């Protein structure tokens, strides 16, 4: 996907570098960061995701912080959730029993590269079709005006 993003960025570079786009992007990102830090339950999902990533990477030890810790002193519920998150991932998902949890990543990257190639071909086809229809429309317009 990163290759497709690079191709897309080069294609639409002028639009991406406009002042209006940059200002709206900065405002949106700031707004999202503020809202994310205000909602403690998003932190619960974030902690679970981080613990999963650490387990897949083969971490020797995982410590999950209570989800409400950045906002207020942690409650007994948030401490219990933090304590049990890594245990649930290890016992119910059997992440500890897997020898190489990220072993199939090469195949996903291969499929991603195939998708990029197909998307780029579709973009090229759409651009050529658009140019072709523009030529036809222009010809019809000229014929209708008697040129």
Curated annotation (Swiss-Prot):
A Pfam family the protein falls into: MM_CoA_mutase
Single GO term (MF): cobalamin binding
GO cellular component: cytoplasm
Gene Ontology BP terms: propionate metabolic process, methylmalonyl pathway
Cysteine disulfide links: none
Entry-linked PANTHER family: METHYLMALONYL-COA MUTASE, MITOCHONDRIAL, METHYLMALONYL-COA MUTASE, MITOCHONDRIAL-RELATED
Similarity remark: To methylmalonyl-CoA mutase.
Protein name, entry field: Methylmalonyl-CoA mutase homolog
Organism: Alkalihalophilus pseudofirmus (strain ATCC BAA-2126 / JCM 17055 / OF4) (Bacillus pseudofirmus)
């Amino acid at each position: 996907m990163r290759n497709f993003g690079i191709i897309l960025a080069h294609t639409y570079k002028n639009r991406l570098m406009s002042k209006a786009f940059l200002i709206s992007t900065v405002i949106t990102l700031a707004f999202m960061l503020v809202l994310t830090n205000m909602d403690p339950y998003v932190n619960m999902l974030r902690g679970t995701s981080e613990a999963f990533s650490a387990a897949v990477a083969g971490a020797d030890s995982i410590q999950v912080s209570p989800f409400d810790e950045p906002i207020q002193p942690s409650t007994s519920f948030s401490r219990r959730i933090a304590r049990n998150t890594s245990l649930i991932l290890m016992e119910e998902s059997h992440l500890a029993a897997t020898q190489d949890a990220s072993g199939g990543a090469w195949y996903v990257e291969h499929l991603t590269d195939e998708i990029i190639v197909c998307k780029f071909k579709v973009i090229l086809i759409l651009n050529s079709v658009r140019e072709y229809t523009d030529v036809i429309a222009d010809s019809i317009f000229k014929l209708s005006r008697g040129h």
